[in-house]
Amino acid sequence: MAVKIRLARGGAKKRPFYRVVVANATAPRDGDFLEKVGTYNPMLASDNSERVVLKKDRIEYWLGTGAKPTERVAKFIEQAGVTLPEKVKKEMEVKAKNRKVRPSKKEAKEA
């Protein structure tokens, strides 16, 4: 079973709140999950300590068992001070390198 560490959306319309969960890769975004390992509240100020709350010990455990974080969650994990496995870092670099940079609407209009 492939396992991912990803965000599951909650909250009301226009008021998002996310749980950082460990879930089966084929499960729906907001469906069943194995464990809740943190929260992310984008409505709080970026300097607020409760904007991203992670259980570091449980994340380290799941990374050790082979769970792969999504790009956004990987950024949160690195900011929290947890080291990602080399394999995950390489995959993120490859994705970033292959990502196409599209011009903004304003730039496209001027060209």
Curated annotation (Swiss-Prot):
Q: What's the name of the protein?
A: Small ribosomal subunit protein bS16
Look up the domain of life of the source. Answer: Bacteria
Example GO biological process? translation
Q: Which family does it belong to?
A: Belongs to the bacterial ribosomal protein bS16 family.
- List GO molecular-function terms, semicolon-separated: structural constituent of ribosome
Signal peptide from the UniProt entry: none
Q: Which InterPro entries match?
A: Ribosomal_bS16 (IPR000307), Ribosomal_bS16_CS (IPR020592), Ribosomal_bS16_dom_sf (IPR023803)
**Keywords for this protein:** Ribonucleoprotein, Ribosomal protein
Q: Is Ribonucleoprotein found in the keyword set?
A: yes
Q: Name one GO cellular component term.
A: cytoplasm
Instruction: State one Pfam family annotation.
Output: Ribosomal_S16
